[in-house]
UniProtKB/Swiss-Prot annotation:
EC number, as in UniProt: 6.1.1.16
Binding positions (ATP): 274
Superkingdom of source: Bacteria
Keyword list, A-Z: Aminoacyl-tRNA synthetase, ATP-binding, Cytoplasm, Ligase, Metal-binding, Nucleotide-binding, Protein biosynthesis, Zinc
UniProt family annotation: Belongs to the class-I aminoacyl-tRNA synthetase family.
HAMAP family attached to this UniProt entry: Cys_tRNA_synth
Cofactors that this protein relies on: Zn(2+)
Protein name, UniProt field: Cysteine--tRNA ligase
A single GO BP: cysteinyl-tRNA aminoacylation
Organism this protein belongs to: Burkholderia thailandensis (strain ATCC 700388 / DSM 13276 / CCUG 48851 / CIP 106301 / E264)
Motif placement: 'HIGH' region: 32-42
Catalytic activity: tRNA(Cys) + L-cysteine + ATP = L-cysteinyl-tRNA(Cys) + AMP + diphosphate
Amino acid sequence: MESLRIYNTLARDKQDFVPRQPGEVRMYVCGITVYDYCHIGHARMVVVFDIVQRWLRAAGYRVTYVRNITDIDDKIIRRALENGETIQSLTRRFIDAMNADFDALGVERPDIEPRATDFIPQMLGMIEKLEANGYAYQAKDGDVNYSVRKFANYGKLSGKSLEDLRAGERVAAKDAKDDPLDFVLWKRAKPEEPAGASWESKYGAGRPGWHIECSAMGCTLLGEHFDIHGGGQDLQFPHHENEIAQSEGATGQTFVNYWMHNGFVQVDSEKMSKSLGNFFTIREVLEKYDAEVVRFFIVRTHYRSPLNYSDVHLDDARASLTRLYTALKDVTPDAAPLDWSEAHAQRFAAAMNDDFNTAVAVAVLFELATEVNRTREPALARQLKRLAGLLGLLGREPREFLQQAAGAARTGALEPDEIEARIAARVAAKQAKNYAEADRIRAELLEAGIALEDKPGGSTEWRRV
């Protein structure tokens, strides 16, 4: 098998992957700030790095995969106050929702999933080291800030110079920072903040800044110098740049060898965002599309390329995944292990070792599917199923998927409000004793892949079948 090459954002080039310890990989990925439901951009990030860790394990590495949870943050505090609930109640609720969404997408749980609030002592310890090393200072407002100008290599990840950054910076007169570019390590508590938002420290009661959370958790769990750090492209600056400044300022050594960033999800060629109103939660998407279809939609594009979200692209992903399942419908794969000497497997491995090029790897799956359709050969069916499994695909019984996909196609991906409108029409028909019409609507919905279940008290629930 060819050696793995990874595009390293720090080097701005593909590099041979050489782990610090032979046969072992330590990888940290920035996770979710849990104050709302996860969106399709989060889905892309977790699926991308799920595939990275799956391939590293398939290549024989012993992987320690850490993906954190940010459970204290300004957004969390604001949302808890708006909702009139505790921070702990809010974060617990959205952690549960996050896990349900990621499980649905077939994302394997990380080896370690630390919560920021469990690592406050380690964060304070790192801040004290930075202060001792001359990188941190306490401002007049009580915040502890990082002095960016003290770190000579600031900007090495993003390619941004301090001069260019300062030219674009505007700072309010009340700002207590020594420099507009300095960033907060420890935020002094404010009287209006709710219980559970601060911890005691030598700097006074307060809470950690976002950037120090990941530095402290990464260094504590993986060591002060580890192999891979990943996250979305939007985290490259300032978050990951600041992580480097903090970690290397505290330890005096290289923080991470390989930095990986997945591309944006776009809608109509614009980055998906709440402010533009083109924002879709995972839950909303899963109301319309099977979770494996969504995963396939993400996987078939290279992780660094923009991913264009639309119903047209998801419908096409469903049709493409249907082709792969159809190839397995009437052929039982044999029970032998994956044969890496086989030509398709070698091309698949070459694609994955070329910076996790899932777009090419998926093309190999379609080549295999064509051969399976032509030969009906169980050994080739096994290769198809095993290789797809490395991407988290084709794990279901083909007939089950195909039946569901056919129903979804018949619906034309019916919107939930359209389904509810038909249910309301059925209720009205029953109230008018027009049972033939009520039965017709039920049958029509079932034909469209929607099953109804009448509940005691007169309510009706629906599900896709």
